[in-house]
Amino acid sequence: MAEREREAMSASLSRLLRTLSSASMSRRHCPLALLQPIPLHQSEIALGSASSGGSAERCCSSCSDDSNNNERCKSAERGTAADEVGEEGREEVELESKEDAVEGEQDELELKRDSSTVNVNVVRANFKCNDMECSLVLGDYVNGFLGSFLSKGLKTNQLVVNTDEKTLRPVARLKEPRDLFALPKDKDNDCSQQAPRWPVECQVIEERIIHIPYVPAVPEPLNAPTGNELKPRPVGEENGIVVFSYSPISAVNYEKPKAKKEDDESSDESDYSSDSRQDSTPPSRSTPMRLAGGGECAPGKLNSVSKMINNVDNRSTSASLDDNDDYYDDEYDTSGGYCGGSGEAKEKAIIKDLIEAKKKRYQEEAEVTPVGGGTARNSRAASRSEASKDASDIDDIWKNNTSEYKPASPRYVLSQFGKNVTKAVIDRIVDHEDLVPPSGSQKVSNQFAVGPVKLPKTNIARLEVAFERSACQDRSKSRLKKKMSSSRRRRESTSDEDSSSSSLGNEEDEEVDDSDSDAENTGSGIGLRRILGSYSARLAGGAEKCPCPGSGSVSDTETLVGDESRSRLAGSNGLHQQDVVCSRNRQAQSRSPLRSVPHTHAATVAAAAAALARGRNRDKDGCLGGKDEKNMGMGVGTTGTSSMGTRTSSPVRNNVFRLSKDQHILLNSMTSQETTGTLISSTSTNQTTTTTNSSQSFLCSDLPQAQFSRSAVGGARFMTNCHPMNPEEYDGLEFESRFESGNLAKAVQITPTYYELYLRPDLYTSRSKQWFYFRVRRTRRKMLYRFSIVNLVKSDSLYNDGMQPVMYSTLGAKEKSEGWRRCGDNICYYRNDDESASSSANEDDEDNSTYTLTFTIEFEHDDDTVFFAHSYPYTYSDLQDYLMEIQRHPVKSKFCKLRLLCRTLAGNNVYYLTVTAPSSNEENMRRKKSIVVSARVHPSETPASWMMKGLMDFITGDTTVAKRLRHKFIFKLVPMLNPDGVIVGNTRNSLTGKDLNRQYRTVIRETYPSIWYTKAMIRRLIEECGVAMYCDMHAHSRKHNIFIYGCENKRNPEKKLTEQVFPLMLHKNSADRFSFESCKFKIQRSKEGTGRIVVWMLGITNSYTIEASFGGSSLGSRKGTHFNTQDYEHMGRAFCETLLDYCDENPNKVKRHAKLFKQIKKIRKREKREQKALKLQKMADQGCIMNDKLKVKRSVEKSVS
């Protein structure tokens, strides 16, 4: 092989790796490491000129224009030595690949490179491996090759690519700062307290929950299961009433369609997973789409509030690289001149501006009479300009808002859409001769349309489509209607003027007027227009009460949904049947008695508003309806289907109407406040099929591979109403979880005393649902309630072994000073009989199964506020309050320094404490070894925080043992490694959707900052003073007692069994809580990424994971009792006391260690004998069975013979 050809191949690979560095493509992860460098065709590559030493290659012309790439090329020419980097205080860590190159020849290597960018889109390599033809196809690196969650880990300027002189392979080097932020020197500035920073997808209530400390005088006993507990199977929300629904919209971004926009500009600094608006979030059906070049989905104005929501959504999904996401610095300033002042005054000014803008727009619409075509065009132009002006004003309000500012309420948003829908009812006679079909750019594919929010009912999206479609079609109808006869036009324009000039308040006043005249005018649309006016007023969720007939008489399940089995009735004369149905519904309403049932329509509206706030450009189906009707030569009022308004038999049944491919279904949803059915008029079969497919893709399509970029922070500004109940009509429990560490997603009322609860999975994941924390209000005393949490994922739990959940009563805390206590009777944890459990073909049945925790509770107070949780909560705010107290303490602050370790993906501070006795003698400080203790890497394991609190209380106290420990050691305490997960209420993962306790081998600092900096801190401590012990605190959900996991030293005879001395001493000091028999010291392959094993591999013998049970103890005097916060804190103190005994150099303590060592040997020998006996017993049992079978077989043979 010619030398020049080898150099050419090396240059091409260098350029490839340099290009892929922006997508976190380090050398060790690159699949091209498996390929032997071989020459390419001269026409395919541009030969790079080798340097004199052959140690670096120049970039080709494709990246010569990029300044960043030029800088990387210059740094690459500096050589392979790590100490030649020009910046002072920085070092390079060489990441050399250890994979062996596969021998063979490469037939073809094609690099398809976009002319406007240096990003590699597709790489296909054909080569031979073990005399076999192989083909390697590498996908789009920029869209996240390294995993399903990471799209931008290592930035471009953090990789330096050189060429190895010996192997001629490109070597990626990661630049790291020499002065690690983990251990700042000579910095005495205090850490300030920070408000929790939420992902922008999450809604946050303005309420800080503070609980009083409380420990029961007598340990609470474990529950005694009888085995006869009731096991109700999940009924599902379709057979109940959704009384709470909150599911944060995921911030993951979906892979791009193959067709890209021509105006999309890409660069090395862009985030491909979140910059593109159409690709980051599926197109929306909820808002009209204003296309580029003046094209519109439908003629008419785009609602100003919809523009505001879209602008908010664009900000929320963009991956901002700025660390300071401050929305509150600028003062609010509009044309009204509001600037400065308090947040309350600004909020009033904002509301006033919105109200004035709305009145002005309505007044202009009332003044302009659309008699002629020019006047109508002027009216539409004025409305469009006014809408754009409002949108800009609202956008300015959003930019300059304050913390007290709340955007427009759902009532304001839905009233706009409700007004558009009522125009659809007025314009009944349609001529489609001049209907302009939508352009090609409007036909956006729905292939990747997925629901951005888990809606409480599948019919919500279809209902939203129906609303938008009717509004979209009506705008076209209003234009075409102007070409009719003059007499008909005058009558139509008169009714149109009356309807458009009346405001929302006037509509509400007119609704209670002559009902007979409304029934007579149904054919012209006036009656239904008034009905829908009242309906749009009710969509606000009961914020304002309006005097409308039947406001509390019918179930909202019946009003919004209707009966699926009866909503598909076909008819030939649609208009006549609609008149008949309307009159029948009027009569049925007048005859039906008033019924008070819980509301569900506001939950539907809330979810629809959430989808509206997140959706963009999803109303494509509404544009296709006009074209289909034109092609078929039919209108809405000529031929179609209608459905009879029927009454739902069960008040708790929540049926859905589905769009069928086989039937002509009406898409103009005309829902009445008084009726319990749904009036539908049809379109063509093609239109129905299109809508069906899009609805299915919106609700049921498979999610493409999601890629996590980075979550914006601050919490959702647009607050939707998660509580659908109307206090006057709903008398059940009120649920809430939009506070710190809360994770309830949905509450469904099956009966007045039975509720099914659904937990939200860890953010950006679909599993990990075990932790729960929620609030209940409006309780009734001496009434037995049953709660069933129906979507848990662990196959076993301590709930089947006597464990109980915890509760906190607000009135109990005030009257009796009670805090968190155990609660619940008839507790049972069992597997659901779902489809995955009954399917024998699925190999992953166990992984896909869900489990239910059910228990009963009887409240002691009326109208109480009660919190329920899996274990005693300990939030990020609780930790900060505690740390600030230490920092402000006059004595503790002298030997306890609070520092900032790093910031998380959401920008939350990760703190660490350095606790040691100050000394002026540097030699004494160097002799001190360090103790590293961390906690809460898993957000749901709150007992770890209580143990850490007990440890910090003891080590900062004034006892003799604490003083001796501070003089002997340097304590490095990281009390909360995963604050992001704690804040949002995750069970196990961080915002990356990954378990941080499996990422201790990571080199990606930006993705796992707390883990990376903790490991860097440990490495530095090992070099400076040494680490005597490392301990990571956790909690366990399947075992009782407290125990330790360690790492055995089989291959080192000198250290064999030494790692077990400290756990045995801890058992001696806390015999009724800590179990040495439960301790394990094995190293499993699945745990190689944990902190315990990674630190042990760094040379730390005493590397432990301490596990505290969520349940209780089975030892000594505490046998059969629950653990409480005092028990966990006691274990933290016992840890410190045992540490001093373990490291004491007193001869008596040394002799004690020798005795303990012998005792450990005896224990392990006994365990081996017992294990051997068990194996022999099993073999004997199997042998006996075989012997019995042989005896039976022989006896049968004898009898036969």
UniProtKB/Swiss-Prot annotation:
Residues 376-385, 639-650 have a biased composition (Low complexity). It comes from the Eukaryota. Disruption phenotype: Semilethal phenotype: females survive, while males die. Most male flies die between the late second instar larval stage and early pupal stage. Mutant males that survive to produce pupal cases initiate morphogenesis but die before head eversion. Almost all male flies that survive past head eversion do complete morphogenesis, and then eclose as 'escaper' males. Escapers display a range of phenotypes that mirror the disease pathology observed in pcd mice, including retinal degeneration. Pfam families: Pepdidase_M14_N, Peptidase_M14. InterPro entries: Cytosolic_carboxypeptidase, Pepdidase_M14_N, Peptidase_M14. Zn(2+) binds at residues 938, 941, 1034. Metallocarboxypeptidase. This is Cytosolic carboxypeptidase Nna1. The gene is Nna1.
